[in-house]
Amino acid sequence: METFKSFDGLTSVNSNIYNYTDKKKGGVNFLIDKSYVPRGTGSSPRLISAYDNGKCISISPIDENQTFEIDLNEKIISVSAISSFVEINKYAFGFGLELPVVPGLQDITIGAGIATCVHGKNQFMYDFGSQIISFEILSFKNELIFCSEKINSEIFNLTIGGLGSTGLIINAVLKLKKISSTLIHRKKLGVNDSNEFLNFYNDSDSNLIGMFGWHDLHTTKKKFGGGFGYKDYLIPGEEILYNQSNTTIEKENDELPLKILSLGKYLFGSLFNKVYVLKENLKSNESKFNVYTGAQSSKGLYWNILRSNGFFEIQFIVPNANYLEFMEYVRFSLKKYNATTSVCISKPSKGEKGYFRFRGDGVNIDMTTLKSKSNFNFSNDINLKAISFGAIPNISKCSILQKSQIERLYGDQALKFYSDYQKIFGDEPPKWFLNNGLYDGKNL
């Protein structure tokens, strides 16, 4: 039995780990049942992939010299479910191609990306689920099932964003897109109040490739929701040349301003010079910058460094109808507890199939708060109050999953998910999927 801790180190669970090995490679496959939680490579710090006093099924990491099957005409790639986004992109870059969606951390595996239907800063256009051609899963009846939009389509849609409730994802075929430019034009815009906030995130400009922002909840009611936002556009005419060989395209890393670099190294160590995203936040209103491998992973690195020095992050999924009310309560609580925080709000992801998908429907509020008594009190208050607003902490981060919350947050989508699951598999999703029994009202 192994012990797993949540990303903030505040909660731990004990689970028995069992390994799945592909029969084709001479390994042993064994009968599993619905009490198993699919854990993939076991690299996730999210407790949703570890069952307390239960069983987890994992897949051994593949060889370092792994190969991918790529079809340049169709722009698709065949991969193992335990290949990471960064490994695939490094390979695809050599052909002038890339994955259309990259999550916040580069080492996330494809299986995890499918199970949580991850998204990047282009989530207002599409999520990772829209980029999947097909995959194979090992069901809880020990059956290997091929799934696509045309073959076993119900299982295909239930698996995307289904957190492993249909079985263990083994491999996948994914879409790639051409890298049409190496430069992005980033425009920074001021947002004065909640009305401008709504207008900013409802932008339907087809040329946008990314959009995000930071909003201050310490302001007065008139300026509530104010802050600034970024909009990213590709700069045409900078098309890269590529070849047919397995090579990677690299660029020299930008250096942070010397004063910032020196301070960062002093506070956080030598890894700080890799946190390029901080530089972009310090730039002037408009900027041009080169695309580089793992662009969003540097943000992940930045937060990991902060966490190791006394910071932590909370994310909530809030229904559209309630998010302004919820934000107002957050602002009130900040003042009440004299807490210090910044808030990031991203536009809701779009679900193409109308299926229940845990990928951030509603509005995500990321609160990065310095560890202190006042901030812990603030966080506990917000966690307990979230459910009264129909909001839940992001389950991919906090592993909180209760059927009553799911139904309230997702409504008809949740009912469709349950009914389709029961129609296909003859019963409800696994118990750990609906309520893992670890969390109750006092530690929500």
Predicted segments with their positions:
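C-terminal substrate-binding/cap subdomain adjacent to the FAD-binding core in PCMH-type
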Residues: 115, 133-325, 329-332
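Glycine-rich N-terminal segment of FAD-binding domains in flavoprotein oxidoreductases
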Residues: 8-107, 117-122, 346, 395-398
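C-terminal structural cap/anchor segments
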Residues: 316-369
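Extended C-terminal subregions enriched in glycine
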Residues: 81, 323, 334-337, 364-366, ...
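Activity-critical C-terminal alpha-helical subdomain
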Residues: 300, 374-380, 387-444
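A short glycine-rich, hydrophobically flanked beta-strand micro-motif that places a catalytic Asp/Glu
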Residues: 210-216, 311-316, 339-352, 393-399
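Short glycine/threonine-rich loop-to-helix capping motif typified by GTGT followed
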Residues: 224-233, 283-289, 351-363, 406-415
